[in-house]
């Protein structure tokens, strides 16, 4: 009669340990895959949120410069939205679309200017000191570091030297589209009563 050799205790323990090690390795891989997928999902959601929200926001009242009873220039104060570090406002990275009563302009933007050389931040001072040859909308950065990026703590003034003046009750719309984030849209109506000259708040 043949004798059958059974598995002794030490061999069973070795097999069991091997199974445990393999199971632990598989669990580790599965856990890592899950964490990686979760992280990627968070990144996609964050990018989607950034694209859906504007990187810029209006920082105060929109100002109009009035000459001979009509608005000939507009200044929109803007800043970086909370949670953003900076927005590149270079002429090749930003588009400024303007809707006037008489015409729509696909892109009136001509770039960034440093406001540190100006004597003050009045709209009349800016328009008399800065010449924009490739368009009539430009950004002046105050408290900046000399580059084209609008950063936290810096003040931006988007100036529009209108090709045709605006009169009372007329409406305009400005859409600022940086390379990232949703567009910033500003709409205003010229007040019914305008002085012959000076600055007027449009709210």
From Swiss-Prot:
GO terms for cellular component: archaeal-type flagellum. GO terms for molecular function: structural molecule activity. Residues 1-6 form a propeptide. InterPro entries: Flagellin/pilin_N_arc (IPR013373), Flagellin_arc (IPR002774). Keywords: Archaeal flagellum. Coiled coil: none annotated. It is found in: Archaeal flagellum. It comes from the Archaea. GO terms for biological process: archaeal or bacterial-type flagellum-dependent cell motility. The keyword Ligase does not apply. Flagellin is the subunit protein which polymerizes to form the filaments of archaeal flagella. Belongs to the archaeal flagellin family. PANTHER family: FLAGELLIN B1 (PTHR35903:SF1). This is Probable flagellin 1. The gene is flaB1.
């Amino acid at each position: 009669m043949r004798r059958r050799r059974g598995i002794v205790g030490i061999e069973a323990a070795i097999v069991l340990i091997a199974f445990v090690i393999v199971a632990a390795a598989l669990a580790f891989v599965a856990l890592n895959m899950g964490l990686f997928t979760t992280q990627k999902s968070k990144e996609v959601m964050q990018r989607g949120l950034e694209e859906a929200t504007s990187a810029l926001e209006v920082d105060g009242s929109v100002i109009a410069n009035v000459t001979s009873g009509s608005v000939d220039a507009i200044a929109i104060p803007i800043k970086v939205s909370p949670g953003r570090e900076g927005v590149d406002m270079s002429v090749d990275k930003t588009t400024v679309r303007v809707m006037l009563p008489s015409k729509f302009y696909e892109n009136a933007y001509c770039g960034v200017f440093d406001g540190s050389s100006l004597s003050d931040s009045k709209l009349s001072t800016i328009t008399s000191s800065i010449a924009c040859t490739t368009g009539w909308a430009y950004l002046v950065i105050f408290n900046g570091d000399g580059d084209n990026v609008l950063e936290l703590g810096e003040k931006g003034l988007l100036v529009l030297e209108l090709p045709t003046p605006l009169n009372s009750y007329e409406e305009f719309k400005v859409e600022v589209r940086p390379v990232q984030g949703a567009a910033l849209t500003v709409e205003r109506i010229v007040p019914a009563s305008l002085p012959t000259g000076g600055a007027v708040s449009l709210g």
